[in-house]
Structures are given as C-alpha cells and as structure tokens.
Amino acid sequence: MLLFTNVNLILALINRYEHGEFWPHLRESNYDYIGGPEDQPSAGKNINVPLNKTRLGDSDYLSIFNQILLPIAHEFRPDIILVSAGYDAAMGCPEGQMKVTPAAYGHLIHSLMAFADGKIGVFLEGGYFIDSLAEGAAMTLRALLGKILDLERRFQYLS
C-alpha cells in the first residue's frame, strides 16, 4: 500500500511473463500496468519489464538496464535504491530458464551505484540453482564493496 500512496517511490520490475502464461499469471506484471489507481499519487510509478521469452542473457538484461531503467533512475534521482535480488534469471536456474551470468549481476549492481550516492540495499529474493545463486550473490557483494569485477571468469558449473 505504501507504493500506492507515496509519490516519491518508483517500483521497477523485470519479470519472466510469457504473455501472462508464467506464474503467477498476474495482469499487473505486464508492461502497461503502471501503478495503483489513477486517483492515487503513485499512478505511473510502476515500471514493469515483462520478458516474453526464456533463455535471455547478459546482453538482454544489460540492454534493459541501459535503455530503460538507468535513464529512469537518472531522471528520478533516487535518495536510496532497494534491490530485491532474485537470481532466478541466473544461468542454470530451472525456474527462470534464463542465461544471466554471475558477472552480469555484479555489473548491474555496479551501474546502480552511480545513483543515490551509492546507497543501495540488496535483499535476497530467489534463485533455485545454488551454484549460480552463490556466484551471483558473490559478484553482487564484490560490486557493492567496490571490488574489480572479473567479467571473464569462468564458473565450474557452466562448463
């Protein structure tokens, strides 16, 4: 409810959607759902990026960030960024069926650090393949700590 009554919040989501055929089959996950009731201050503050294909990878997610989410963040100028980090899109996860590498998670977080004076909270949401979840979380932490990201690193479970 906080989202519907607060004009100072933006909710941005990247979801596997498959034209509403993927769980949880919510109409609210589609691109044209833009937030609460029109008479609430939050109308237009919900940004959904529904993914209608599986097996999308780093370049797809980086494009979503660079072409959609980062320009919105630049315009909105947030005071803080909270990330619900679902690693379902990680390579090897049976639920997400995507191909995002652990290094890409680090890169995405690193790109968000340019906003809100680097004030970012990251909360684990999901991911069902422990190897890619662990590596993705490690790369996320490395980015938060300002460590150099090894984008060429190869992971044992991927070979």
Feature names for model-found ranges:
Residues 1-159:
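A general "terminal functional-core" signal
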